[in-house]
Amino acid sequence: MGDSSSSTSWSSKKDTEDDRMIAFMLSEEYSKLDGAVGRRLSNLAPVPHVPRINCYIPNLNDATLDHQRLLQRLNVYGLCELKVSGDGNCQFRALSDQLYRSPEYHKQVRREVVKQLKECRSMYESYVPMKYKRYYKKMGKFGEWGDHITLQAAADRFAAKICLLTSFRDTCFIEIIPQYQAPKGVLWLSFWSEVHYNSLYDIQAAPVQHKPKRKHWLF
């Protein structure tokens, strides 16, 4: 029993180390692409981020208008989205694509974010209007929508500044900064109407798009 437990623990530790090594290598390789997106948006004044749970889901008409607004902004700034599946995991898929250049590591990203929530409770608990343990357990489930608290936890866990190009009428650009360390990289996401995230690229450096499943998409 002891050997089995020790083996499982070693395997889990190795997986985590491998994930972080891959992320580091890819962040070095793609730093020029991230810089290209940053130059496109350099004239935008970011709005400070406020961690919060999801509390508003737009109706179809509002979502349609927001989607059109986001498409216009992408066009104006010469950016494009790598679209990820709308299966409830989109925030984690988009973060995975920015970290690993593949949305398929979303389970690992979610797991790291939930670890951050559990291990650093005092940093996030005041933003959660429910039993905190219930909140982070819920966030650990496949298909549970990420929110603005998980974005902050991701920024803290991966030591990355997360930049959102949004569809909001009054807020075009939001920055999420790690709370207690200098960011080592930048992750770029598009954020549509509180319901969907995609991974963001300079249009001239966009990777080949593999068509995702369209489950639960409005568009």
Swiss-Prot record:
Molecular functions per Gene Ontology: cysteine-type deubiquitinase activity
Residue intervals of the OTU domain: 79-203
Record flagged with keyword Iron-sulfur: no
SUPFAM superfamilies: Cysteine proteinases
Enzyme Commission (EC) number: 3.4.19.12
Keyword list, A-Z: Hydrolase, Ubl conjugation pathway
General function of this protein: Hydrolase that can remove conjugated ubiquitin from proteins in vitro and may therefore play an important regulatory role at the level of protein turnover by preventing degradation. Inactive cysteine protease.
Protein name from the UniProt record: OVARIAN TUMOR DOMAIN-containing deubiquitinating enzyme 12
Organism of derivation: Arabidopsis thaliana
Lineage: Eukaryota, Viridiplantae, Streptophyta, Embryophyta, Tracheophyta
Gene: OTU12
